[in-house]
Structure formats: structure tokens, C-alpha cells
């Protein structure tokens, strides 16, 4: 290995601004950094000499980045895990396979990536120490496996084959593992369950360019026609939080409670549906809800709850179409999907990262994530653009609130729940840390076997 320098930082940022097909980070930077858009269009086949004009190396420890216009959230953008620094040599050696051979400055090195298994070995040259001066990381090896379903994953946990389960379905825990009392009595694995508010939102998307959802009254009727509290409490067994306000969850410095969201109002929903030409759901077209999940999952239960609420309250029949993410996205691109499950987890902790999803500039880009609903509002775009330039935190948050409130006013989507990030850990695993963006830090973990 070698020492990381400012040249490496510039190389990675240039790469992230490029038009190369394997670059997935362009949307974060190309409209923010001076010269990045021009570089993006010219670097489709290869990286160009000199890189982005707005990114300059001052010395071996300093890089300057010139923005197109002020953006106070830019430091948060740079925390995105996809902008982790890697050396030029790694890309030149592995090319399109570089993602399978990660090279960086982290606490672990990839030893194996095969089929459903990844093995990480300790990086003995890692630069970081803990507060007591102990060299990190403490673990010698981490093995990760992918299970076919959560039930088999939980059984592996019970059989002590794995020590950590992510995104656990609450309703399965006691059935598979038994109660906490049984664990304390030694009848099953001693474990702890941690739940953290996640900076993620689940919503259902509407095709704004297709009937019946090109009519805002139908979109509003669907939003008023469901009881989000009931769905969370009855169908999801309390997992997650109903979107009582806007689309953006609470983020440090931003309070979503200022946005007035949709609440159950069956009378208003029926009135709007009738005004749109579908009294009591009569003549409403056949509707499929594309859901990228498997039967029995929490997302399936959420979709089932919405389906049953729409039938009960609006007499609208919805057929669940369970599929892969790729199938869902392809159906949206072809215009076949009119109604689908969508979601977003923050790339970085800033409201702008949620709200930029619905900028009209993404229409026509065929993006599989950005503005799939084709929401088009000049007013929204103006508010969003103003928020990105604004330096005063209070004024900036006021603009975010106005954006989020406009998404509700126009019923751009059906906001449903802000998610929990629930993990289950063997009690012998100490110092496990995660954050609201569901990122994991293994560098401080150590194992302390229980005394017999």
C-alpha cells in the first residue's frame, strides 16, 4: 500500500463526475461543481486529462472545489459512501470489475466475494486508533452471507451460525427465537434488538402522465382514503412511523411537523373520486400495484394494508404485482406501471437529498430512482433551487417546508411510512454501531464470550 494524497481525492471526484457507464454517483455532483457537467458529457468513453476544472489540487493534503453556486449542504454530499477514496491504480488494473476489488483506507480488506458470501480480513495497516490508543479494528475477520429469506436467516441466528441480522421482521422474532426470557434462561441465543429511526421513507408512486393518476383529484382521493396509523399498528405491528406530515423525515436541524400531511378522510376521498368521474369507485380502471418484494415481508403487508383500505373506503380494486426491482423499474419506464412501491434512504443527511427526487430536471433522463412519477411543477423547482443557494439555515428550512408542502398539495406521491432500522445482535458482540442512514461501522466491534 501507499499513503493517500490529494491527487487520489481529485481522481475519485473526477471519476464521480464522469460519464462512464459504471459511474453511479454523477447525480450527486455534476450540477454542483464548476465544469462537472461539461466534463460529464465529454468523458463517456474514458476519463480525460486534467479532470473537472472546478476541482484542483493545492498540495498533497489539500483539494479545492469550486461550486457553480453556493450550496451549504455540500459538505454532507461528500460523506456519501459512494465517494469513498480509491487509488487510480485500482481502477486501471480492474476496470469494470473494480467494485469487486475494493481498495481504500478502511479497517478491513476484502478476502473473498463469491456467490452469496463476502469475507473481510483485518487491515493491519489501518490508520485509526480508539480513544485509549488501541489499534483498530479489533476483529480479525468478518464473514457475510446472503439468505434466501428472513426465516432461514433467523434460524441461522438461532443455530449460532451468524451473529447479526439486519432489517428483521418484528412479527417473526419470537416465533423463530422464542421470548427474551427463554434467551435469558439459556434455552436460545442471548441477543439484543436495536431499533433506530432511519432516514428513509416508503411511498407509493403514481404515473402522472397516465390515466387515472394524471388527475390530481384521484391522487388526493387515494391519499385521503387510507389510514396510515391503522396500517402501521395493525399490519406492520408497530414497525415504522406513519407519514403524518410530508415526505421528508426529521433530520437534524429540520422538523417535519411543520408540514401538514394527509390524514384519513373517507368523505373527502369519495367526493374527490366522484368529481374525477368514479362515484363509489364505479368504472375505475383495473389497477396493478407493482411491489418489489416477496409474499409475507413487511413491504408486502404494507401493500396489503393499502389494497384493503382502498377497497373498503373507496371501492377500488387493486391487484398486487410482486416483482423484482428491475421488473418494477422496467415497467415504469415502459409506462405499464401506473402505481408502484417506491422508497428512498438518504444518501446524506440533508432534506435536499429527499426533495431533489421530484425535480422536473430528471424527467426524460430515464433514471430508475429520480422522479419516476414525472412530477412537473415550476413552482416546486423554483423553491428547490432557491433552497440550494440559500445560506441562512432558517430561511433554507422554510423553503424545504414549502417544497414538502407542495408535494402534499399536488399529491405527487402517496407518503406512507418513515422506516425503522431494526437489527438483532448476539449479546457477545460488543460496540456494534450504526446510524440513521443504516450504515454499519465494524471497526470498534469486539467479541466477549459469556462466562459459563
For each predicted feature, which ranges?
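Short helix-initiation/N-cap motifs at beta->coil->alpha
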Residues: 103, 144-155, 168-171, 320-330
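A local structural motif
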Residues: 65, 133-145, 161, 282-288, ...
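Structural transition elements
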Residues: 108, 242-276, 293-302
